[in-house]
């Protein structure tokens, strides 16, 4: 049986704004130069929910940038700063910087510019920050040749209707998600974070080009009791219209993370076909 492992050579150069550009080229087969064509794009975003740089790099060492994007959240970014994020980008990974900005328009706009300068692939902000904040963010990165995807956070997947009621929103989570997603789209954002249950109605409301990033993805939802309530399997989420699937523990705690990624990508290819 032929060896199907890929070797990657990392090419680095600066763009006209001085940012580092990266490209992976498969050196075993020059015809395969970019896994993430529109037909081959992997939907998986692996949440690197580690507490330190050592554990993160130890895990990422075994991953293939062709099989997934990666996400750094508040805990890891606070612990390691931008050095780890830039290291992962330089290794060829598309990085989702999940810091959920929520501040005055100028502050969020400047933060998005810094993320763009780093070469971040995706960055998010709370859509509840309002139109002026989101428009400022979109304007801040508009001049970049390869700008990060700007994603609005709608309703956290840990929240249920009772949680919304406690903060004064007497509305179903699905209605609030659609309301905030429409606001995000009209404010110039590229997509939103939403649970898979909201993906189908959002597709109907906002069209096929709007990016839907879905956390709460589990390989098997039976017996799930973690802190994300509105969950689905990869196949269910993709069928519902999700663009990207955020997976943390199902990948990071798997005995064979690469096998999990290959299986999810196999399911994704079947859904696409």
What are these regions (language model features)?
Residues 28-51, 55-58, 200, 204-205:
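N-terminal amphipathic alpha-helix/helix-capping segment at the start of soluble metabolic enzymes
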Residues 134-138, 251-273:
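C-terminal helical cap(s) of enzyme catalytic domains, especially alpha/beta-barrels
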Residues 84-96, 139-151, 202-219, 264-272:
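Alpha-helix-loop-beta-strand connector modules within alpha/beta enzyme cores
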Residues 125-130, 230, 234-260:
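Glycine-rich phosphate-binding active-site loops on the catalytic face of alpha/beta enzymes
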Residues 44-48, 70-72, 95-99, 123-125, ...:
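Hydrophobic faces of well-ordered beta-strands that scaffold small-molecule active sites
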Residues 106-114, 225-242:
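Catalytic cores of alpha/beta
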Residues 41, 103, 107-111, 118-190, ...:
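Conserved anion-binding
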């Amino acid at each position: 049986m032929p060896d199907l492992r890929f070797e990657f050579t990392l090419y680095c150069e600066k763009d006209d704004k001085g940012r580092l550009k990266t490209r992976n080229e498969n050196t075993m087969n020059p015809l395969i130069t970019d896994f993430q064509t529109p037909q081959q794009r992997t939907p998986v975003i692996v949440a690197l929910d580690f507490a330190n740089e050592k554990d993160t790099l130890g895990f990422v060492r075994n991953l293939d940038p062709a099989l997934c994007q990666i996400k750094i959240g508040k805990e890891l970014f606070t612990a390691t700063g931008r050095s780890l994020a830039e290291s992962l980008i330089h290794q060829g990974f598309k990085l989702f910087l999940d810091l959920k900005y929520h501040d005055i328009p100028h502050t969020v706009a400047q933060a998005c510019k810094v993320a763009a300068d780093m070469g971040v692939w995706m960055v998010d902000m709370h859509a509840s920050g309002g139109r002026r904040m989101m428009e400022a963010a979109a304007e801040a990165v508009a001049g970049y040749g390869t700008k990060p995807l700007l994603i609005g956070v709608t309703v956290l997947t840990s929240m249920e209707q009772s949680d919304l009621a406690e903060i004064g929103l007497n509305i179903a989570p699905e209605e609030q998600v659609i309301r905030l997603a429409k606001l995000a789209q009209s404010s110039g954002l590229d997509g939103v974070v939403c649970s898979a249950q909201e993906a189908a109605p959002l597709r109907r409301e906002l069209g096929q080009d709007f990016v839907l990033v879905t956390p709460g993805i589990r390989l098997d939802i039976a017996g799930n009791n973690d802190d994300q309530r509105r969950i689905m399997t990869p196949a269910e989420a993709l069928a519902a219209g999700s663009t990207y699937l955020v997976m943390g523990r199902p990948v990071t705690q798997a005995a064979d993370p690469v096998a999990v990624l290959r299986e999810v990508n196999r399911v994704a290819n079947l859904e696409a076909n």
